[in-house]
């Protein structure tokens, strides 16, 4: 079995050393006999979700989160198409917030989200603990 993991923005969305999450995931998959192809997409690249089986994005600062959100807005249709064909998303920390309808920052400015989930997020709001977010 072969699995392609697309690591989105490891250069900017790596607040807590997200490379280690990917390394552990890869090691466990390979121990199970899975061949892992890791594709890193930096903020300088145009993301291509065509062959991705899993898309991973880690947490970033509030500023990098907004920059990434603005960049991904241009690729939301391609991201939807990847989800429609069965690609999985694993977004940690504030990266998950980008998937909702909006993110309101500490100054009250509302940023449009990618709209893949029906939730909204506000700075200072108690974090929801989710085991799984199923996006339909």
Language-model features: where?
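Conserved anion/nucleotide-ligand pocket segment
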Residues: 136
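N-terminal beta1-alpha1 cap of cysteine-dependent amidohydrolase-like domains
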Residues: 1-84, 122
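Cysteine-nucleophile active-site neighborhood
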Residues: 62-133
């Amino acid at each position: 079995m072969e699995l392609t993991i697309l690591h989105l923005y490891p250069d900017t969305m790596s607040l807590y050393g997200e490379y280690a999450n990917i390394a552990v995931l890869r090691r466990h998959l390979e121990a199970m006999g899975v061949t892992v192809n890791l594709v890193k997409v930096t903020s300088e690249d145009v993301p291509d979700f065509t062959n991705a089986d899993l898309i991973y994005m880690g947490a970033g600062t509030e500023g990098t989160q907004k920059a990434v959100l603005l960049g991904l807005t241009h690729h939301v249709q391609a991201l939807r198409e990847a989800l429609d064909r069965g690609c999985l998303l694993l977004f940690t920390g504030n990266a998950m917030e980008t998937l909702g309808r909006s993110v309101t920052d500490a100054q009250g400015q509302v940023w449009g989200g990618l709209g893949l989930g029906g939730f909204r997020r506000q700075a200072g709001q108690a974090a929801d603990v989710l085991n799984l977010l199923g996006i339909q």
